[in-house]
């Protein structure tokens, strides 16, 4: 049913005036960047950045309220209680997990935290105008944009700047909005299924969503990519019952804005956008053609053109970067098994139990005419998304967030079928089996840190590996700080688990002292440059047994060879207390042509494949010799 035009309300005016105020501040900061206002802070946070973050949440809440009105969703008292209980359970679990863990965030797990610290410093040092420009550039040119950090800046203002509290604030900020939208999604799906027991369906749906481990894995490990899922569910809610039979400019505006926000959140959400809108567009146009509603086709085409033109303008620099890059080559180290292997991985992520629920929902959804189109849409969306994603790389836990809506929909259809049962004993038995298993599955994942869980359960351990070597890592760090002066570095070759350079860099955050002396490291073929610190660092560290990733072991073998070792002497070693021993080598002779030539010969094949990552580095080193 088409929504009627509405009058402006107080929320609309607040958003309009706050947007105008920020726009004025942006212009003034470009002209007069040194005004005291742009240097003011609140609890150490730059006030203009704080204001931008508050505005971002205000804008998001405005979108959510409009989407709720447009979908016509109404929550009963029992629905609200179920939602409140679900959020309470989740937030309590996150708090427990964060308070009991012994974990060092590293690599992608700590990157958003570093970016959060960085965006605060950037806005304070460079001003509001340049800070916003940096955010825009990060969307255009970086794999990780600062959009998520803009949203998290205001909540993060009032807590100590530690990685654990960054995760806590991310959860407290994102989960309420996300699960409110999931609750709306359940109510919309309920209209399609028309269960006989609506209250049970909602409670069961919330149970399935709360206990779905794939939703929580990334955030619990420090990656707030879950924010993008808010935009995804908003897009689904705006399109799931809309067929372009009537013009709705507000809906078009919201969709275009949400598509932009989804792309800006994380670049790989574009795979979901492509798959979803291809499926959606084909469905809408086919329906219109079959019913001979040519005006619907016209509206669909015009919306597509307007959206495409807007995205082309907004993301033109990003489009150029993507077209020039050869991601299938540079990300080849992450493409380990292709499409078929990814299907197997997804089955393992889900586990036999949840996979059975999804398959049951698929069969039931196809059999029932009311849910047939929705079920087929979800299936095609899943397989199409996986197919185009694996043209570049395979999916990690965080990437799998883009499949969560389809998985959840198929589980809801399964449970919706149960809620249509008329015999009470069958209803009680079936719902107990499905929800009982999902609860057990969630509990197993929530209490496990194992790399591999039994096949009936989701292979998604939610407890990070508990470290027993933090004091030993700190001892290595203290040694590095004592022996490295300003400008000197210690290069750590291992690049796997449990040891890699980032483990040492991140161990004492928010103290960044060690990061000034320990480089990020290099190992991934096609992505990382040749580690020139093998020839420039004052110290080089390696370990036994070795922790490998991609080229790391080859770098280690090369370093321990005769020619490089002529330039080093071992000066220290550290027993990490878990079977690993670290050895520290000090450079006693400066690099020379023989050493450079040795690495050139050893990595000739890699340089031939990626000259910009190897030969260019060696050329610069040779220039330094001259």
Locations of regions flagged by a protein language model:
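Loop-to-helix entry region of an early transmembrane alpha helix in multi-pass inner-membrane enzymes
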Residues: 142-180, 218, 222
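Transmembrane-lumen/periplasm boundary regions of multi-pass, lipid-linked membrane glycan transferases
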Residues: 112, 118-122, 273-283, 287-371, ...
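Start-transfer (signal-anchor) and selected internal transmembrane alpha helices
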Residues: 1-95, 199-202, 298-307
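Transmembrane-helix motifs of polytopic, lipid-linked glycan transferases
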Residues: 66, 165-195, 234, 361-366
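Short acidic/glycine- and proline-prone juxtamembrane loop motifs at membrane-interface regions
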Residues: 217-227, 396-397
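Membrane-proximal lumenal/periplasmic loop motifs of glycosylation machinery
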Residues: 99-110, 123-150, 171, 345-349
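Membrane-proximal, lumen/periplasm-facing interface regions of secretory-pathway glyco-
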Residues: 432-482, 496-502
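C-terminal luminal/periplasmic domains and tails of membrane-associated envelope-modifying transferases
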Residues: 462-492, 497, 506-626
